[in-house]
């Protein structure tokens, strides 16, 4: 009878877990569809447009052609060896899904919809992987909580909403699956689990440059266990299998190549691999000789190996056989390094330090359950707990110095918070007791009800907060911006697509477009036109050329752009409707990057006022007002307002017609409805041999043209 009841209870628990997990999977997907419901099925932001373009190339061509793809429509005139400079995991996975749906199941689905819905689908897989990982750390109840947290937590949703077709859409899934198999392998010594961890590590390497995090975290875990005296044959078989298979497999990715054995980023893994061989040998020798001799041999051996390792690594790095640390790595330890030495890295908003409120905004009450969970793991310090603690400490620091690394911190916050909350529920939701003194005291029951009820209420607030943040903050595609009319109605600002469509329909197919690198992928993806620079940022000098053109006087800019066969110049201007992400706000980064290459020609100080202010009104410096970007941004802007005095709603400064010098070398050919995107065409040389400035002055003196300008009806800022 008892066994039957136990069997029925076990079946019921299994069914209940399945139902809960189906609900979690549904919540993970549905919460990421706000962008499609509010806007449409569209690729978001910047990098996803390149990934989408590359995926289309893959499905229209063979995988061989994809790996050997040379793109002559980017980085003109240099081009880009695209197939050998990208992580193909995202594109190949999408192409496989598209092929399976279209050719195996006969569904006439477009590749764009596969790309748009890719991230929500894999978020469900992430929830499963987090469940399995947390179950290895504590138990199934903690695993379900962790899965529920990761399914809707804003810190992960920010990079996995529908349309966010970026590498992180699949990378966090692979991160958690790799860690799950690693913990299983470390606990059991299973070569199969270690092999699975290595294969998913290879998959991770193919999908995201952040694979280096795994490359260093797993060796750190092994190193800490060795220092704690917890070496075992299980640990040896798990790590050596993972490292050997994972390293060889990762070297098959063209973009990675020999980096695992020739880069400082990977040397920790190699060093721990060598160390664990020595420890294994020492463990064998320990049984053959006396303890005193063993200690002497081990101390001498470790000292010699440490010295030889440091000297060898330094020598190989000096000789160029091992690549030094990258600029992004240095910027993690010195937050001013990139700003001083590599401004192109510092100019990326994702590389800025995170503000403290962002931790609560992205994780809600999980952020204060997080340290409690880590503390509980310290109390019961198992080998797998050491991994979570190391993960927590490292990512807590890294997320504090770089915004984008909040994404890697979020999973361990969910895991640790689930451990803490599960422990609380284990105690306060257990209403069965054999102790009579608790049974006769209603205060104990009341305490349990209050504590458990409070945390259930916090869970409700967490769901409410996560839904609100997802809907309002993380579901905008950035190429279409939501705003409001003066009467409060929703208005969609579609200037980006309007401008790119104009370029696509009104310019020659081989036209070259100069714009700041932020918009290169979008121009290539939506306008299908050749660009000088894009978001790949592999050539700092080429980016500096565009920055120099924007910062130079008009005549000099014209010559620079003409040398590079540019036909059109595209600038983003937000002064009319209050869009703060425009080129004027990014202008100082353009100046700093170009100053790093041409310090004698471009000086940041020249763009400030005598008082050291960055201004765009009548008090702006002459260098600022004569720069090409200033002229293109503010051309005809004051004439929009009665009396000729316009207010830049981003900088909150007054602009008059006298503040804006005329343009003589460029023709305005397009300005979007809300003046966010402005496109100019380089003028042809004068047929009579006159300079374009002389022609412009003659035209202004002989005629006075009036332009009919319509102001948009948007009354609120973006």
From Swiss-Prot:
Where does the motif DXD motif 1 lie? 45-47
Q: What is this protein called?
A: Dolichyl-diphosphooligosaccharide--protein glycosyltransferase subunit STT3
User: Mutating residue 593 to D has which effect?
Assistant: Temperature-sensitive
Q: What UniProt keywords are attached to this protein's entry?
A: Endoplasmic reticulum, Glycoprotein, Glycosyltransferase, Magnesium, Manganese, Membrane, Metal-binding, Transferase, Transmembrane, Transmembrane helix
Q: What organism, scientifically named, is this protein from?
A: Saccharomyces cerevisiae (strain ATCC 204508 / S288c)
Q: Can you list the GO cellular component terms from the UniProt entry?
A: endoplasmic reticulum; endoplasmic reticulum membrane; oligosaccharyltransferase complex
Q: What is known of its domains?
A: Despite low primary sequence conservation between eukaryotic catalytic subunits and bacterial and archaeal single subunit OSTs (ssOST), structural comparison revealed several common motifs at spatially equivalent positions, like the DXD motif 1 on the external loop 1 and the DXD motif 2 on the external loop 2 involved in binding of the metal ion cofactor and the carboxamide group of the acceptor asparagine, the conserved Glu residue of the TIXE/SVSE motif on the external loop 5 involved in catalysis, as well as the WWDYG and the DK/MI motifs in the globular domain that define the binding pocket for the +2 Ser/Thr of the acceptor sequon.
Cytoplasmic compartment segments: 1-8, 138-139, 189-190, 228-232, 287-300, 379-384, 428-441
Q: Which gene encodes it?
A: STT3
Extra remark: Present with 3000 molecules/cell in log phase SD medium.
Write out the residue ranges of the motif DXD motif 2.
166-168
């Amino acid at each position: 009878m008892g066994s039957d009841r136990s069997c029925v209870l076990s079946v019921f628990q299994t069914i209940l877990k399945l139902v809960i997990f189906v609900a979690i999977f549904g919540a993970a997907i549905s919460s990421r569809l706000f962008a499609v419901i509010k806007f449409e099925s569209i690729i978001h932001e910047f990098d996803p447009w390149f990934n989408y373009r590359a995926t289309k190339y893959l499905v229209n061509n063979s995988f061989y052609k994809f790996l050997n793809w040379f793109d002559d429509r980017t980085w003109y005139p240099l081009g880009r060896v695209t197939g050998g400079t990208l992580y193909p995991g995202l594109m190949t996975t999408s192409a496989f899904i598209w092929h399976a749906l279209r050719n195996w199941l006969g569904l006439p689905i477009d590749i764009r919809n596969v790309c748009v819905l890719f991230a929500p689908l894999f978020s469900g897989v992430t929830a499963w992987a987090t469940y399995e990982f947390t179950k290895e750390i504590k138990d199934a109840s903690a695993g379900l909580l962790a899965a529920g947290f990761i399914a809707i937590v804003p810190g992960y949703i920010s990079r996995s909403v529908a349309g966010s077709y970026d590498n992180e859409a699949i990378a966090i899934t692979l991160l958690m699956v790799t860690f799950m198999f690693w913990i299983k392998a470390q606990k059991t010594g299973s070569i199969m689990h270690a092999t699975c961890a290595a294969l998913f590590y290879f998959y991770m390497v193919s999908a995201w440059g952040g694979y280096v995090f795994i490359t260093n975290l797993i060796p750190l875990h092994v190193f800490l266990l060795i220092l704690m005296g917890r070496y075992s044959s299980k640990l040896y078989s798990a790590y050596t299998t993972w490292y050997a298979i994972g390293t060889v497999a990762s070297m098959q990715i063209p973009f990675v190549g020999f980096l695992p054995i020739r880069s400082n980023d990977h040397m920790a893994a190699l060093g721990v691999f060598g160390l664990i061989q020595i420890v294994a040998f020492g463990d064998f020798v320990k049984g053959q000789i006396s303890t005193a001799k063993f200690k002497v041999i081990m101390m001498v051996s470790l000292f010699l190996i440490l010295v030889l390792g440091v000297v060898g690594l330094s020598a190989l790095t000096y000789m160029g056989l091992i690549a030094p640390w990258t600029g992004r790595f240095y910027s993690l330890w010195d937050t001013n390094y990139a700003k001083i030495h590599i401004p192109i890295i510092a100019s990326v908003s994702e590389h800025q330090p995170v503000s403290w409120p962002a931790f609560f905004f992205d994780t809600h009450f999980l952020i204060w359950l997080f340290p409690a969970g880590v503390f509980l793991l310290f109390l019961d310090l198992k080998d797998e707990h050491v991994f979570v603690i190391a993960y927590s400490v490292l990512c807590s620091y890294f997320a504090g110095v770089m915004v984008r690394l909040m994404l890697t911190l979020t999973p361990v916050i969910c895991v640790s918070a689930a451990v803490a909350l599960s422990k609380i529920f284990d105690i306060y939701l257990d209403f069965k007791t054999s102790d009579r003194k608790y049974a006769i005291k209603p205060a104990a029951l009341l305490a349990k009800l209050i504590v458990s009820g409070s945390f259930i209420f916090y869970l409700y607030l967490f769901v409410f907060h996560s839904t609100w943040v997802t809907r309002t903050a993380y579901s905008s595609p950035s190429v279409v911006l939501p705003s409001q009319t003066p009467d409060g109605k929703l208005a969609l600002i579609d200037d980006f697509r309007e401008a790119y469509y104009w370029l696509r329909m009104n310019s020659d197919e081989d036209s070259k477009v100069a714009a700041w690198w932020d918009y290169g992928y979008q121009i290539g993806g939506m306008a299908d036109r050749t660009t000088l620079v894009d978001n790949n940022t592999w050539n700092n000098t080429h980016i500096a050329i565009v920055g120099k053109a924007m910062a130079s006087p008009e005549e000099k800019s014209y010559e620079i752009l003409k040398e590079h066969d540019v036909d059109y110049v595209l600038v983003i201007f937000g002064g009319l409707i209050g869009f703060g992400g425009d080129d004027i706000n990014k202008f100082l980064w353009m100046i700093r990057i170009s100053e790093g290459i041409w310090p004698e020609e471009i000086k940041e100080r020249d763009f400030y006022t005598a008082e050291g202010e960055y201004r765009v009104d009548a008090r702006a410096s002459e260098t600022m007002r004569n720069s090409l970007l200033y002229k293109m941004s503010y051309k005809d802007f004051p004439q929009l307002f009665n009396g000729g005095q316009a207010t830049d709603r981003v900088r909150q400064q007054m602009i008059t017609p006298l503040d804006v010098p005329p343009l003589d070398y460029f023709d305005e050919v397009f300005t979007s409805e809300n003046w966010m995107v402005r496109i100019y065409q380089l003028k042809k040389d004068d047929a009579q041999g006159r300079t374009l400035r002389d022609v412009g002055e003659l035209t202004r003196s002989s005629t006075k043209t009036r332009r009919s300008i319509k102001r948009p009806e948007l009354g609120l800022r973006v």
